[in-house]
Design a protein with these regions (language model features):
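RNA pseudouridine synthases
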Residues: 1-139
């Protein structure tokens, strides 16, 4: 997320619906459907950015993007929802900094809980390395 999130962990509970300005864009609106996003900080990069782990209680279209934008912390690279393009350019990002490291769901046929994991793709690993170089951890 762009900027420094104040809390180490929090929940965003805000309804999401279609934005009137676009067929593709969504926003927090009282007329929207319920949406709940839980998050934990995994790494901080000064006030420039914050790496978070997200757990969705609901699955609305663009939920992560809309919820973080609504609290003033859009995803890096997500200009549709207010990200400053300078950080993306600095990191060489050509997309939103969004990746599912782990998904858990009940298999539709077997009904068994299934977990799928994935590493960060190369472009996000490079961006993460650049952020760590720009913001070394303090001992």
């Amino acid at each position: 997320m762009q900027g420094g999130l104040k809390e180490d962990r929090a929940t965003i509970e805000a309804p999401i619906g279609r934005a009137k300005v676009s067929d593709f864009r969504f926003c927090v609106t009282p007329a929207g459907k319920p949406a709940v996003t839980h998050w934990d900080v995994t790494e901080r990069f000064g006030g420039e950015a914050t790496l978070v782990s997200v757990n969705l209680e609901t699955g609305r279209t663009h939920q992560i993007r809309v919820h973080f934008s609504s609290i003033g912390h859009p995803l890096a690279g997500d200009t549709m929802y207010g990200a400053n393009p300078v950080l993306s350019e600095t990191l060489g990002l050509e997309r939103q900094w969004l990746h599912a490291v782990q998904l858990e769901f009940r298999h539709p046929r077997t009904r068994v809980w299934t977990t799928v994991t994935s590493r960060h793709p190369a472009d996000l690993e490079r961006a993460l390395d650049l952020m760590r170089a720009r913001h070394p951890r303090q001992a």
